[in-house]
């Protein structure tokens, strides 16, 4: 059975990581962020669940 040649694996993995790093840096650098972001206040409406408005009876299981 022939041996698997692993001499190039380190170079392949390192070049892949370097390429991914460069690609992500280019992708992130294209985003434009506003220098002064302002929070938008949104009103949250509390939704009423049916069991909050009516009384429900919970039974214990028979032992």
From Swiss-Prot:
Q: Member of which family?
A: Belongs to the ATPase protein 8 family.
GO BP term, example: proton motive force-driven ATP synthesis
Q: What's the name of the protein?
A: ATP synthase F(0) complex subunit 8
List residues modified as N6-acetyllysine. 57
Locate the transmembrane regions by residue number: 8-24
What this chain does, per the entry, is described as:
Subunit 8, of the mitochondrial membrane ATP synthase complex (F(1)F(0) ATP synthase or Complex V) that produces ATP from ADP in the presence of a proton gradient across the membrane which is generated by electron transport complexes of the respiratory chain. ATP synthase complex consist of a soluble F(1) head domain - the catalytic core - and a membrane F(1) domain - the membrane proton channel. These two domains are linked by a central stalk rotating inside the F(1) region and a stationary peripheral stalk.
Starting at the broadest rank, the lineage of the source organism is: Eukaryota, Metazoa, Chordata, Craniata, Vertebrata
What gene name is given for the protein in this entry? MT-ATP8
Q: How does it sit in the membrane?
A: Single-pass membrane protein
Q: Gene Ontology cellular component?
A: mitochondrial membrane; proton-transporting ATP synthase complex
């Amino acid at each position: 059975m022939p041996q698997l040649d692993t001499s190039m694996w380190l170079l392949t993995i390192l070049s892949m990581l370097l390429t991914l790093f460069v690609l992500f840096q280019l992708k992130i650098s294209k985003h434009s962020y506003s220098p002064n972001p302002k929070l938008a206040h949104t009103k949250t409406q509390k939704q009423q669940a049916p069991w909050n408005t009516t009384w429900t009876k919970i039974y214990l299981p028979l032992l």
